Curated annotation (Swiss-Prot):
S-adenosyl-L-methionine binds at residues 82, 107-111. InterPro entries: Alpha/beta_knot_MTases, tRNA_m1G_MTases_N, tRNA_mtfrase_aTrm56. It is an enzyme of class 2 (transferase). It comes from Methanospirillum hungatei JF-1 (strain ATCC 27890 / DSM 864 / NBRC 100397 / JF-1). This is tRNA (cytidine(56)-2'-O)-methyltransferase. The keyword ATP-binding does not apply. The lineage of its organism: Archaea, Methanobacteriati, Methanobacteriota, Stenosarchaea group, Methanomicrobia. GO terms for molecular function: tRNA (cytidine(56)-2'-O)-methyltransferase activity.
Amino acid sequence: MIVVLRIGHRPQRDMRVTTHVGLTARALGADGMYIAADDRGVVTSIRDVADRFGGEFFVEDKVGWNSCIKRWKQDGGVVVHLTMFGLNLPDVEEEIRTKEKILVIVGAEKVPGDLYQMADYNVAVTNQPHSEIAGLAVFLDHIAPNALHREFPGAKVRVFPNPCGKTVEEL
């Protein structure tokens, strides 16, 4: 099980990016997303996509990040904080891949310093500044089994690969 925890979300500024964090998580193998802020718009957008395109994916806002992390660890899960200051992904991915319950923290603004100590792994997708969406996508591609070949049961819409154009089927 892989779940994303989005912290530092600022509703007026980060709605689009946080929505894309959730959509990326869903498409690339995560089971759900917690948002440590109150933003029904983001929740509604992600749930709408999950409803139309299928698959099981939950999204929940108004989650206290500190208590979420503590609860996750008490339940036997590991916490991975994506940060450019962490250990390089290729150096830890094999070990992380063996874990059954992974909470992936994706920050928006500067994260609290104690988060680095709370995480079991501080992981960098390069030690260079870039998008948190890109970092999550690369991380999930390396960690989630067969993420690029997933099926999404219960879809109302299906997109088919097409070398030149669009093929979309309403189910």
